[in-house]
Amino acid sequence: SSLKLSDSDKGKVLVGKGALEDYIAVLSQEIYGIHHVKVIVKLEDQCIDVRINASIEPGINIPETSGEIKSNVRETIKKVTGIEVKEIELFFKQIKAKEE
């Protein structure tokens, strides 16, 4: 499934759900201490709901890091696609060091 970014007499621009999920996973992993990210996007009416499942390194401040992830995802998705991110739910499945 996909979300329409624009529609004109010259054609449509769509972005796929999978493309958004992959991009949000990359954005989430840009934040220090976050790894093993899986993203689920739910398409709404010209906006999206996001669930991010991730692991976080021990000793990382979870509330602060969660805020960074949410801000980064919201701002970047809006800037790059024009899509509003309605809700972001974060689930940390593990507090564990990243294995190299």
Roles of regions detected by a PLM:
Residues P58-E100:
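Cytosol-/stroma-facing membrane-proximal "stalk/adaptor" domains immediately downstream
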Residues I31-E57, F92-A97:
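Short edge beta-strands and adjacent turn/loop segments
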Residues S1-V37, K42-D45:
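Elongated extramembrane "stalk/tether" segments
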Residues L5-D9, N53-P58:
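Short amphipathic alpha-helical segments at helix-loop
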